[in-house]
From Swiss-Prot:
Function: Converts 2C-methyl-D-erythritol 2,4-cyclodiphosphate (ME-2,4cPP) into 1-hydroxy-2-methyl-2-(E)-butenyl 4-diphosphate.
GO biological process: isopentenyl diphosphate biosynthetic process, methylerythritol 4-phosphate pathway; terpenoid biosynthetic process
Protein name: 4-hydroxy-3-methylbut-2-en-1-yl diphosphate synthase (flavodoxin)
Keywords: 4Fe-4S, Iron, Iron-sulfur, Isoprene biosynthesis, Metal-binding, Oxidoreductase
InterPro entries, A to Z: Dihydropteroate_synth-like_sf, IspG_bac, IspG_bac-typ, NO2/SO3_Rdtase_4Fe4S_sf
Family: Belongs to the IspG family.
Any Pfam family the entry gives: GcpE
Bound cofactor: record note: Binds 1 [4Fe-4S] cluster.
Chain's gene name: ispG
Organism whose genome encodes this protein: Xylella fastidiosa (strain 9a5c)
HAMAP family linked to this entry: IspG (MF_00159)
EC number: 1.17.7.3
Cofactor: [4Fe-4S] cluster
Pathway: Isoprenoid biosynthesis; isopentenyl diphosphate biosynthesis via DXP pathway; isopentenyl diphosphate from 1-deoxy-D-xylulose 5-phosphate: step 5/6
The organism's place on the tree of life at top rank: Bacteria
Length: 417
């Protein structure tokens, strides 16, 4: 299915020109829609648990899923995970996350090398000393042999120490030395871009390379990616590393990525949230989708506008209805994206009183203005800007959801009656 992009009027900024990289059946960069990816946190060697989590992430909307490949057992598990996913009818590109020993694992487990859609390589720990160039070359040779793209992902938590020492020495010789943060950014960028250019020299085509350079500070990340985007034409993967738990992680990631996306920088994103105990891993996928949709880059599910509530809305009914409607349309999109293409661009409004309720509802495709405190117990519904019907009684929620479903059927059905 072709990913839906918001209307041109919602995305006035130009996208950065990059190479287009094919990762399985997904294309990243080259003007294609920004892709959502995620990562498992299971022991990859546990085939059952890993398959289950990949499936959950895919059902939530992840378009690529990365798995840790850190030992022989996890490398051997990758083909079995892919086989189980295929039996479930799930076709999602699997990305192998390699550190330290990827060259050896891919050589020892050719089935793993063949099944993976992309290899993630960390230039900071691909090898040390004299082994660095050798082991990096072996990874690139494997990518060439199997026709796989790579992501060269630098991270300030695992910097290339030799490169860092070199750039520190050069900085000390400057007449006006840079501050430490600026040198750190330069190390990250040189590590990623320099490794990519070396991969090209070794024979890997430019359109099989994605870059990332992650830090955990919002302003540092923005500065790194602005600079890196200006220095190369490789597709870029965005992510704030170790963003944190709960609302802090969501806010930090959104603050950084929204700025870069607004400037046309970024071809694929991941929201690196620390899950709370017992929380589903799928939250990072939902947040990534909502970020892309609220910034006008993609459309995944109908968006529900709802007021925050005030003294006029002492009843919790409008809050409950907004939550119910949001969950209803998200659940329905599993089917609607096939049978009713375009439904994901629909806007809904669930408002709590007469002040902004009718006006906001008119702006939506379909909206409802519920009665506030002291108002008449009626709820006018507006469809495409016009008042359509007034709902009353105890079944307002069910009646409104029925109107939403009817609207989707009439407007977006692929095969209308």
């Amino acid at each position: 299915m072709t990913p839906q992009v918001a209307s041109d009027s919602a995305v006035p900024w130009p996208r950065r020109r990059t190479q287009a990289v094919n990762i399985g059946h997904v294309t990243v960069g080259g003007g294609h829609p920004v892709v959502v990816q995620s990562m498992t946190n299971t022991d990859t060697a546990d085939v059952v648990a890993s398959t289950k989590q990949v499936a959950e992430l895919w059902r939530a909307g992840s378009e690529m899923v990365r798995l840790t490949v850190n030992n022989a057992q996890s490398a051997a598990a990758i083909p079995r995970i892919a086989e189980r996913l295929a039996m479930m009818g799930i076709d999602v590109p699997l990305i192998g996350d390699f550190h330290y020993n990827g060259h050896q694992l891919l050589a020892d487990e050719p089935a793993c090398a063949e099944v993976l859609a992309k290899y993630r390589i960390n230039p900071g720990n691909v090898g040390f000393g004299k082994k660095r160039d050798l082991q990096f070359g072996q990874l690139i040779e494997c990518a060439i042999r199997y026709g796989k793209p790579i992501r060269i992902g630098a991270n300030w938590g695992s910097l290339d120490q030799m490169l860092a020492a070199q750039l520190m020495d050069e900085n000390n010789r400057r007449k006006q030395p840079w501050d430490a943060a600026q040198v750190l950014r330069e190390v990250l960028i040189c590590s990623a871009v320099g490794s990519a250019e070396r991969a090209v020299e070794l024979g890997l085509p430019r359109d099989r390379i994605v870059l990332s350079a992650k830090v955990s500070g919002v302003q540092e990340l923005i500065a790194v990616y602005r600079d890196m985007a200006a220095r190369c034409d490789f597709a870029l993967h965005l992510g704030l590393t170790e963003a944190g738990i709960g609302s802090k992680g969501i806010v930090a990631s959104s603050a950084a990525l929204a700025v870069l996306l607004q400037e046309g920088i970024g071809d694929t994103i991941r929201i690196s949230l620390t899950p709370e105990p017992g929380q589903s891993r799928t939250q990072e996928v939902i947040v990534a989708q909502e970020l892309l949709q609220t910034t006008g880059h993609r459309a995944f599910t109908p968006m529900v506008t709802a007021c925050p509530g005030c003294g006029r809305t002492t009843s919790e009914f409008f809050q409950e209805l907004a939550k119910t409607v949001q969950q209803h349309v998200r659940d329905k999109m599993q089917v609607w994206k096939i049978t009713h293409p375009g439904a994901e661009t629909m806007t809904l409004a669930v408002m709590g009183c007469v002040v902004n309720g009718p006006g906001e509802s008119r702006h939506a495709n379909i909206g409802i203005s519920l009665p506030g405190t002291g108002e008449m117990p009626v709820a006018p519904v507006f469809i495409d800007g016009e008042k359509s019907v007034t709902l009353r009684g105890e079944n307002i929620a069910q009646d409104f959801i029925a109107l939403v479903d009817d609207y989707v059927e009439r407007r977006y059905a692929r095969f209308p009656d």
